[in-house]
A protein has these predicted regions:
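Amphipathic alpha-helical effector-binding/dimerization core
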Residues: 1-37
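Generic alpha-helical structural context detector
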Residues: 20-24, 58, 120
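Amphipathic alpha-helical regulatory segments at dimerization interfaces
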Residues: 25, 63, 121-125
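Cysteine/selenocysteine-centered motifs that mediate thiol-based redox chemistry or coordinate metal-sulfur cofactors
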Residues: 33-41, 116-128
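Acyl-group handling in specialized metabolite and lipid biosynthesis
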Residues: 44
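Extended hydrophobic
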Residues: 48-118
């Protein structure tokens, strides 16, 4: 199995679980300033509708994690949780991803819960 090399490569916030986890904790004005007016499509699964993206971000805030299933690359999917500071602003993201063929919706939710737990542990380690 080949793994993508995303080091030093800017990734689209709207088409990755890590980007969505980060965006979820920003205010609407901040998101509007960061995201392009038109969200580019990378695969047939990429969310390009702003209102649909806003619904996904609201769900990410509710559950604590964001999911991405083949939205940036056809062969990968993952779940991510933001590490929040004391003001509940995102300072980092815990990302768990793998081959889309091995990640069912149930597994993505499990990965998301694991990412939330790890993000909380990191937050606690960073707290003064």
């Amino acid at each position: 199995m080949m793994a993508p090399n995303w080091l030093d490569k800017p990734l689209p916030l709207h088409a990755t679980s890590g980007g969505k986890a980060f965006l979820a904790w920003l205010g609407r004005d901040e998101r509007d300033a960061i995201l392009p007016a038109e969200l580019p499509r990378y695969t047939d699964h990429t969310v390009t509708d702003r209102e649909e993206l806003e619904r996904e971000l609201a769900e990410a805030r509710r559950t604590g994690f964001a999911m991405c299933d083949r939205e940036y690359e056809e062969f990968s999917s993952g779940s991510s949780a933001a590490v929040l500071n004391s003001r509940r602003s995102p300072i980092a993201v815990v990302n768990v991803w793998g081959p889309a063929a091995m990640n069912s919706a149930r597994r993505l939710r499990e990965m998301g819960r694991e990412a939330v737990q790890t993000a909380g542990e990191i937050r606690d380690l960073l707290a003064p």
